[in-house]
């Protein structure tokens, strides 16, 4: 371990194996907190490489509680958070809409770090059981098409890093690991990142982790596909990363100001999402969710973004996605 940490002091990058070893020690609670802070700081200042991120993610997955992985194609749709814009819960809402469009989604999430209402805060407000067993969660993905894995239930070892992270009060590699350590191990993923500098490295990380098809996005300041500006995309297809830019027009929607999709506290967000999923959403809110669902549908082989967007809007207006929220609340 000393050799690994000394390497970081010299601002040298770790191999994937070394990073996995370092994070295995952290997750088991075997690394002194002062050394942990030093290692996290050194990684942050140097800039984490895809090898280092993949190694850390593999360590966390290896130490996670097991989950009965489906043998069919299924996805996660998730953002790193931390973009500082406090929009409505787009990826959580999109998970239900995607399921109503026929996709399978096992969404990994946590309590809110920086926004007023994280995905679990919202699900809580709908009466969805965040402590559902792995078996019940898996059966929800099978039968309803969507379920939610609450991070602390599967990644108990992350608690060893919490005091250090809270004291450091700055972003570390842990801020980008969440979306990469879904214990269900989906083979398809749409992941939003808080900075465009992360788009390519995270796509390279996903490639190293064996993701079948995925897209990493940053939308003009948001960790989602944007309707207020351009979205930078790095898409993994057939083992190759394709980078491109999408505009609202590519989805057949109008451009809307960021203000139009502002969120609030969990109760306000619950009201907004209920409206959205029962045909009473605003054009901007519907578009914001639909463009994210549309890109996720592309990852399942439905290539026409405009048709996908329209299908997602129709599903929201029909109330079909809201029925899935109710089903999941009754599931366990």
From Swiss-Prot:
Q: Which Pfam families match?
A: Glycos_trans_3N (PF02885), Glycos_transf_3 (PF00591)
Give the residues the record marks as binding anthranilate 1.
79, 110
Task: Please indicate if the UniProt record lists Lyase as a keyword.
Answer: no
Q: Which GO terms describe its molecular function?
A: anthranilate phosphoribosyltransferase activity; magnesium ion binding
* Biological processes per GO annotation: L-tryptophan biosynthetic process
InterPro entries xrefs:
Anthranilate_Pribosyl_Tfrase, Glycosyl_Trfase_fam3, Glycosyl_Trfase_fam3_N_dom, Glycosyl_Trfase_fam3_N_dom_sf, Nuc_phospho_transferase
Q: Which cofactor does it need?
A: Mg(2+)
The UniProt keywords, alphabetically, are:
Amino-acid biosynthesis, Aromatic amino acid biosynthesis, Glycosyltransferase, Magnesium, Metal-binding, Transferase, Tryptophan biosynthesis
Its cellular-component GO annotations read: cytosol
Q: Which residues are involved in binding anthranilate 2?
A: 165
Q: Which pathway is it part of?
A: Amino-acid biosynthesis; L-tryptophan biosynthesis; L-tryptophan from chorismate: step 2/5
Work out whether the entry's keyword set contains Glycosyltransferase. Answer: yes
List positions binding Mg(2+) 2.
223-224
Q: What class of enzyme is it?
A: transferase
Please list the residues that bind Mg(2+) 1. Answer: 91, 224
Query: Which top-rank group of organisms is this from?
Result: Bacteria
Q: What is its EC number?
A: 2.4.2.18
Q: How the protein assembles, per its UniProt entry?
A: Homodimer.
What family does the entry list? Belongs to the anthranilate phosphoribosyltransferase family.
This one is known as Anthranilate phosphoribosyltransferase
Gene field: trpD
